[in-house]
Design a protein with these regions (language model features):
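Mid-chain, well-packed structural core segment of small domains
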Residues: 58-83
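Core segments of cupin and vicinal oxygen chelate
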Residues: 1-5, 11-47
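Secondary-structure boundary/capping motif
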Residues: 19-20, 64, 99
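Vicinal oxygen chelate
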Residues: 1-6, 12, 76-120
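Short linear motifs in intrinsically disordered
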Residues: 27-30, 66-68, 89-92
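Conserved short beta-strand elements that form part of the metal-binding/catalytic scaffold
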Residues: 28-63, 102-105, 109-116
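A structure-centric signal for secondary-structure junctions around beta-strands
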Residues: 4-7, 43, 59-62, 96-97
Length: 120
């Protein structure tokens, strides 16, 4: 059976797409706008949540992007140096790895995920 091989893009509305795109490039290092972002290999999770979840922070929020990082502590330090508020909660961490949360300048929640090291 043929199946999907990965996520080809993430598209969302923004009040000021150019400015928000630059924020994602400058703060998170994600190539956006006119370029293609070649990701490093790693797991991707697609997980529908119940309609009444509070996991996305805002009731009207229909989605939340989760970016994989290799060193969550270093990323948190970098973001805080830039004055970006970072939320962590030990209850979010699991056998899947460690998590933190930020918001982009338009209030969209962004989850940062350091996957757990796989045992050989």
């Amino acid at each position: 059976m043929t199946k999907v091989s990965g996520i080809g893009g993430i598209f969302f509305r923004a009040e000021d797409p150019a400015t928000l795109g630059r924020w994602y490039e400058d703060v998170l290092g994600v190539d956006v706008l006119e370029r293609i972002w070649i990701q490093t290999e790693g797991p991707t999770v697609l997980a529908p949540f119940p309609k009444d979840t509070d996991y996305f922070d805002r009731p009207e929020q229909q989605w939340m992007i989760n970016f994989r990082v290799t060193d969550l502590d270093a990323m948190i330090a970098k973001l805080r140096e830039r004055g970006i508020s970072v939320t962590t909660n030990p209850d979010w961490n699991s056998e899947a790895g460690r998590f933190a949360r930020i918001h982009d300048p338009e209030g969209n929640p962004i989850e940062l995920w350091e996957p757990a090291q796989r045992q050989a």
